[in-house]
Design a protein with these regions (language model features):
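Residues that line or immediately flank small-molecule/substrate-binding pockets and catalytic motifs
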Residues: 8, 40, 83
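Sec-dependent N-terminal signal peptides
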Residues: 3-13
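Boundary at the C-terminal end of the N-terminal hydrophobic targeting segment
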Residues: 16-19
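Active-site-adjacent "subsite" loops/lids of carbohydrate-active enzymes
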Residues: 31-33, 39, 43-62, 131, ...
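Short, well-ordered coil/turn segments that N-cap beta-strands
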Residues: 30-33, 75-77, 123-129
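Aromatic- and glycine-enriched glycan-recognition loops and surfaces
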Residues: 53-74, 101-125
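Aromatic-lined carbohydrate-binding/catalytic grooves of carbohydrate-active enzymes
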Residues: 74-110
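N-terminal module-boundary/linker segments of secreted carbohydrate-active enzymes
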Residues: 21-30
């Protein structure tokens, strides 16, 4: 019983000293991260409309501004924005095509760089943006993004079942 008591005391001393060491290394963390995931695939979070003209692109931007305003009021300071969806992107890329979530047509630009816009709007509100990329899977074998990636890098993608 005495040994158990000694082990118990040593364990708590070690745990307490670890906390003091950790605090000494990082006494003032930059800040507390209060983050949300902002999903773009299928318009789950944003966008809820397609940018097929200047007017509709502005409406799409307003949707994001409204979301960010609500997040700011909720004291969110970090947005994890889905920027790459199944081998397609929401920003201009020389490697992968535009995702259809913005324009409604896979491979078609919405007329603006949605990632740049999101970064600028988040920074206006004192928020950070972190890119959330979906790396695997790239999508169904015959989806637009997968086909484009296969054309450019045929050895990069391996078909794993009937759908890809």
């Amino acid at each position: 019983m005495r040994y158990l008591y000694i082990i118990f005391i040593l364990f708590h001393l070690a745990a307490a000293s670890y906390g003091q060491i950790f605090y000494a290394v990082n006494p003032n963390p930059k800040y507390e991260v209060r983050a949300v995931w902002l999903t773009t695939i299928g318009g789950i979070d944003w966008p809820h409309s397609y940018a097929q003209s200047e007017r509709s692109a502005e409406k799409q931007k307003e949707e994001l501004r409204a979301i960010l305003d609500r997040l700011q009021k909720a004291n969110i300071n970090t947005v994890l924005l889905q920027t790459r969806i199944r081998a397609t992107t929401i920003y201009p890329s020389q490697y992968e095509p535009w995702d259809g979530c913005l324009s409604g047509i896979p491979g078609k630009s919405p007329g603006y760089d949605a990632l740049r816009f999101a970064i600028d709007e988040c920074h206006k509100r004192g928020m950070e943006v972190h890119a959330w990329v979906v790396t695997i899977p790239v999508g169904k074998w015959n989806s637009y993004g997968c086909r484009q990636l296969r054309k450019r890098f045929p050895r990069l993608i391996k078909r794993i079942d009937q759908d890809g």
